[in-house]
């Protein structure tokens, strides 16, 4: 083997991601004046409010792209994207704190500009 050489088993073919999970296609527009980049595992319901789309159906979904990748929305740009449901326990914490727990039986917090920690 040569240092840095990659040996790939071509017999494996293509690797399919997120097989059997619910997906949805969505049109998203950036109404802001700056580019917005969204990472692969960011809870799409909680993305920057300058991105306009119907939010409610996106609870519990993320971008259907490989881990570590992102999609960039330029100002004024409209894109059609595909989302995939979160799997596992479907517990979502952090982001903008809109859902702090199980997405299927969540308690919704209000997304606001109030930065005070209580």
Swiss-Prot record:
UniProt pathway annotation: Nitrogen metabolism; urea degradation; CO(2) and NH(3) from urea (urease route): step 1/1
GO cellular component term, pick one: urease complex
Catalytic activity: urea + 2 H2O + H(+) = hydrogencarbonate + 2 NH4(+)
Domain of life, source organism: Bacteria
Single GO MF descriptor: urease activity
Keywords noted in UniProt: Cytoplasm, Hydrolase
Subcellular location: Cytoplasm
Gene3D superfamilies xrefs: Urease, beta subunit
InterPro entries reported for this sequence: Urease_beta-like (IPR002019), Urease_betasu_sf (IPR036461), Urease_subunit (IPR050069)
GO BP, one annotated term: urea catabolic process
EC number: 3.5.1.5
Main location: cytoplasm
Family: Belongs to the urease beta subunit family.
Quaternary assembly: Heterotrimer of UreA (gamma), UreB (beta) and UreC (alpha) subunits. Three heterotrimers associate to form the active enzyme.
HAMAP family: Urease_beta
Protein's UniProt name: Urease subunit beta
Organism of origin: Aliivibrio fischeri (strain MJ11)
Recorded name of the encoding gene: ureB
């Amino acid at each position: 083997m040569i240092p840095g050489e990659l040996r790939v088993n071509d017999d494996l073919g293509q690797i399919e991601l997120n097989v059997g999970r619910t997906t949805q296609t969505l049109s998203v527009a950036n109404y802001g004046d700056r580019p917005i980049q969204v990472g692969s595992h960011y809870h799409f319901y909680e993305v920057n409010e300058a991105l306009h789309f119907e939010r409610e159906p996106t609870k519990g979904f993320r971008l259907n792209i490989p881990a570590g990748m992102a999609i960039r929305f330029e100002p004024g740009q409209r894109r059609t994207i595909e989302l995939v449901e979160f799997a596992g326990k479907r517990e979502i914490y952090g982001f903008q704190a809109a859902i702090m727990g199980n997405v299927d039986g969540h308690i919704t917090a209000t997304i606001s500009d109030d930065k005070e920690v209580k």
